[in-house]
Amino acid sequence: MVHIISKKTVSFIGQKLAAQIDEQLFTKYGFKVEQLMELAGLAAAQAIAAHYPKSNVAVLCGPGNNGGDGFVCARHLQQFGFTPSIVYPKESRNELMKSLVVQCETSSIPITATLPTNLQAFPLIVDALFGFSFHPPTREPFTEMLKTVRASGIHVFSIDVPSGWDVELGAPSGNDDDVIHPHSVISLTLPKLCMKNWTGPHFLGGRFVPKSLVDEHELLMPQYPGFEQIVKLED
């Protein structure tokens, strides 16, 4: 059972502050990208395991850090008894991403560049295409993929920011058939401003922010119970 807290007790942050917090974690505080990626992906997998029954899961991974979170999430989902398949439409040359690919390949997790032809065999899709640095609109090879996912009606779990959303303003108005409208979301570190009015299942993970960094930015951080890595936000 995931501990529930009021979303009024945590800060919602914009794109600039989110980037600043990451930069400070990687420099002043000595964290490595792969450390935080592992924690983020594990938190996402824990939220999924708490909210959904074991099933086939299609994990859509972009070439950046959000995609890395997706690879880690897929690996942990397999450990939790799910059957993940990764969709990786745009490969990264980054050595960390290459390592994550190897980790999943050697765990016999399928990796393809396109959506499965039997997409309806996957009751859940994990959206890990774009992170908080994304600026609309979407571009290929992602646009058509997002349209297919949107039209499928399959439940989508988004990691941090739903694909196609402006990080601060949320889903664009008008023609948005290439924009994910998720059924559930996990925010990482702190929820972004685009999630302020979100009313669906909303998890939060990222139990690693040093107190001095919290104090510097006067942030409201969640009170995680015991040794839990995620909480659930409600009104």
From Swiss-Prot:
Species lineage: Eukaryota, Metazoa, Ecdysozoa, Nematoda, Chromadorea
Tagged with keyword Metal-binding: yes
Organism of provenance: Caenorhabditis elegans
Organism domain of life: Eukaryota
Pfam families, alphabetized: YjeF_N
SUPFAM superfamilies the UniProt entry points to: YjeF N-terminal domain-like
Cofactors that this protein relies on: K(+)
Family the entry assigns: Belongs to the NnrE/AIBP family.
Details of cofactor binding: Binds 1 potassium ion per subunit.
Any one Gene Ontology cellular component term annotated for this protein: mitochondrion
Span of domain YjeF N-terminal: 18-221
Functional summary from the UniProt entry: Catalyzes the epimerization of the S- and R-forms of NAD(P)HX, a damaged form of NAD(P)H that is a result of enzymatic or heat-dependent hydration. This is a prerequisite for the S-specific NAD(P)H-hydrate dehydratase to allow the repair of both epimers of NAD(P)HX.
GO function term, MF aspect, one: NAD(P)HX epimerase activity
PANTHER family named in the record: NAD(P)H-HYDRATE EPIMERASE
Binding locations of (6S)-NADPHX: N65, N66, G67, G68, D69, G131, F132, S133, F134, H135, P136, P137, D160
EC number, as in UniProt: 5.1.99.6
Enzyme class (EC, first level): isomerase
Protein name: NAD(P)H-hydrate epimerase
Keyword Ribosomal protein among UniProt keywords: no
Catalytic activity: (6R)-NADHX = (6S)-NADHX; (6R)-NADPHX = (6S)-NADPHX
